[in-house]
A protein has these predicted regions:
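Beta1/beta-strand and adjacent pyrophosphate-binding region of the FAD-binding site
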Residues: 2-14
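FAD/FMN-dependent oxidoreductases across multiple families
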Residues: 68, 232-329
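Short beta-strand to alpha-helix junction loop
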Residues: 93-114, 234-238
Length: 415
């Protein structure tokens, strides 16, 4: 049975929350974003992918993002003794934009939040309190929270959307189980005044003695993050700053690309683990963005999944039918699981072993003939399109199983 949703309360104001609010407000739906601003600015730089540019165009903010973003034509992966693997978007984007941007997260979030405000969404800077309805698979805003919203809502909103990220407010209230991945890593990140970059604008991902790192060139600095097994992070120092600074000095790769670099910011640290919620929708509630699931920062899939889920949830809300919400849930869970699979191929070494074998065999006439086709579909990993491309994923699975030519992928695994 179709339900016309006229009012929505969104918990949070991150990218997925703001994008969803903007899309719904444009449709005349009454939307409120309920969030308490962060005490500390999120320092990480975001490396966008071409698939996100399409969403920025839909929101009408591409030019604003371009004004402070660093033009990004591709990505480069360093695999130590196995060399560099550069990927240029122009080689395999097809109808998709052949570029993206690297952006400071705080400015990017402000752009999307202002977009939501311009569309008509109301922002309440409050700590929203949500309660479980006794004996039901349902939540509601507390009387205190409704009162803080003044007369914006006449009673409970038709839909409560949890976009609180890892806080996972609604899943915790409703005891919604989640599937966790096998990795338990620590991520450390900060901004440096400089770091060695092989290609201008490219995001650089590098295999380390333990774990891997990103270098995201911004307009006036470099965001450098390190992701490594938590047991190795703990050995690097007593504080996040000690751990980060020691890793820059002691890792055999990082010390070569940060010579003379100065850290400009404090170090932020979080647990990097993989989680996919088993349910994303229910009676009067839905999950979006990282609340629905998060995988890994490699390949910049997190923001892509979050913004894609926002556009798909907006479609479901406009439709209003149970089938539309179930379609949303199936689609996002499938997207998350697909990226989980892709990320695992990176960590277990199969992905870049396959790329290396392909390069080694290009003199073979058959390989030379089929290489452009294979390259186009494998390249969709880096544009963000792979998670929604069934044929590309089927080709990837085939190559991961049959395309390694007796090479041991452990040699290129992330340790």
């Amino acid at each position: 049975m179709k339900k016309q949703i006229q009012s929505v309360a969104i918990l949070g104001a991150g990218p997925a929350a703001s994008a969803l609010a903007a899309l719904l407000a444009r449709e005349g739906i009454r939307v409120a974003l309920l969030h308490r601003p962060r005490a500390a600015a999120l320092l990480v730089g975001e490396s966008l992918v071409p698939a996100i540019i399409l969403i920025l165009r839909k929101l009408g903010v591409e030019d604003e993002v371009r004004s402070y973003g660093k033009y990004k034509p591709g990505a480069i992966f360093n695999m130590n003794e196995f060399g560099d693997f550069p990927f240029t978007f122009d080689d395999f984007c097809g109808k998709m934009p052949d570029y993206a941007f690297n952006v400071p997260r705080i400015k990017f979030e402000a752009t999307l939040l202002n977009c939501a405000k311009r569309a008509g969404a109301k922002v309440f800077e409050i700590e929203a309190k949500v309660e479980r309805v006794t004996g039901e698979d349902k939540v509601r805003l507390s009387a205190e929270t409704l009162a803080a919203c003044g007369d914006f809502f006449t009673g409970q909103p038709d839909l409560i959307v949890d976009a609180t990220g890892r806080a996972r407010v609604v899943p915790k209230l409703l005891d919604i189980p989640a599937r966790e991945g096998g990795r338990k890593d620590t991520a450390l990140f900060a901004h440096l005044d400089k770091a060695e970059l092989y290609k201008s604008g490219y995001v650089h991902s590098s295999r380390l003695d333990h774990g891997w790192s990103w270098r995201i060139p911004l307009q006036d600095r470099v965001s450098l993050g390190i992701v490594l097994p938590s047991e190795h992070a703990a050995k690097a120092g007593a504080t996040p700053e000690e751990r980060y600074d020691n890793l820059l000095k002691n890792d055999s790769y990082l010390r070569t690309v940060t010579v003379g670099s100065k850290r400009l910011t404090p170090v932020m640290e979080y647990s990097n683990y993989q989680l996919v919620s088993s349910r994303l929708v229910g009676d009067g509630w839905a999950l979006v963005g990282d609340t629905a699931g998060f995988i890994d920062p490699v390949f910049s899939s997190g923001l892509l999944i979050g913004l894609t889920s926002a556009t798909e949830l907006a479609d479901a809300i406009r439709d209003g039918t149970p089938d539309a919400f179930q379609k949303y849930e199936r689609g996002v869970i499938h997207h998350l699981k697909t990226w989980h699979e892709i990320v695992n191929y990176y960590y277990d070494g199969k992905m870049f072993t396959s790329f290396r074998v392909g390069e080694m065999m290009r003199k073979n006439p058959l390989i030379r003939l089929t290489f452009p086709h294979i390259n186009k579909h494998m390249g969709r990993i880096f544009t963000g399109a792979a998670g929604k491309a069934a044929y590309s994923m089927a080709m990837m699975r085939f190559l991961m199983k049959y395309g390694l030519k007796n090479e041991d992928p452990q040699a290129m695994a992330i340790r």
